[in-house]
């Protein structure tokens, strides 16, 4: 994917991605609009090879994904295999699991996710974390998002800054991007 290329985040049309035929029709519409890349998330059941064929047939690149963190914990080899099929190096999670949403939890997640991110990096993949506004809640002198970024391994734990959620949380998106 080109550095400044815009991709369609498929989670925004998840209501139209329930079945393989829905997915095929929606991907065609996304391509017809002019997108050349998509982020996979919020889709109904479809095998990775079938999805890859659909995107290839339309000339769409799968540039990144959002998957359930529990899947990374329980089946990292399967996650890697799926992303090999996609030809996609960026593997993200769409949100922090609820059990980590406190000061200690943010730290524990940063440490645990860094280990998973390191394992992904060893296989040539990049772990990305997608924020929401709740990570801007303060815990002492730091926000949850600061805890995540400061307590994780910055060589393998990468940010996917969602400017909407940063703004909604009352912070400056440009400042977060620069940091």
What does each of the following model-derived ranges do?
Residues 1-89:
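N-terminal pre-domain/capping segments
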Residues 21-25, 76-77, 105-114, 141-146, ...:
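Charged helix-capping and loop-helix junction motifs
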Residues 74-113:
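Glycine/small-residue-rich loop that forms an oxyanion/phosphate-binding "nest" at active or ligand-binding sites
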Residues 118-179:
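Acidic/histidine-rich catalytic cores of soluble enzymes
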Residues 9-13, 41-43, 66-70, 96-98, ...:
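Active-site beta-loop-alpha junctions enriched in small/polar residues
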Residues 7, 63, 92, 128, ...:
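Structural detector of well-ordered beta-strand residues that form the stable sheet scaffold
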Residues 49-67, 113-120, 146-154:
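Alpha-helix-loop-beta-strand connector modules within alpha/beta enzyme cores
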Residues 17, 45, 73, 100-103, ...:
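Loop/helix-junction capping segments adjacent to catalytic residues or to phosphate/diphosphate-binding pockets
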């Amino acid at each position: 994917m080109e550095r400044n290329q815009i991709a369609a985040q498929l989670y925004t049309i998840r209501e139209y991605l329930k079945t393989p035929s829905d997915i095929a029709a929606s991907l065609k519409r996304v391509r017809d609009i002019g997108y050349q890349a998509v982020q996979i998330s919020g889709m109904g059941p479809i095998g990775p090879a079938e999805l890859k064929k659909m995107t290839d047939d339309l000339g769409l690149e799968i540039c990144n994904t959002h998957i359930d963190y529990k899947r990374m914990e329980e089946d990292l080899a399967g996650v890697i295999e799926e992303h090999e099929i996609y030809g996609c190096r960026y593997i993200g999670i769409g949100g922090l699991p609820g059990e980590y949403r406190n000061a200690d939890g943010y730290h524990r997640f940063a440490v645990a996710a860094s280990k998973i991110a390191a394992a992904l990096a060893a296989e040539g993949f990049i772990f990305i974390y997608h924020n929401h506004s709740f990570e801007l809640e303060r815990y002492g002198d730091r926000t949850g998002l600061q805890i995540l970024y400061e307590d994780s391994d910055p060589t393998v734990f990468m940010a996917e800054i969602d400017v909407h959620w940063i703004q909604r949380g009352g912070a400056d998106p440009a400042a977060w991007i620069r940091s």
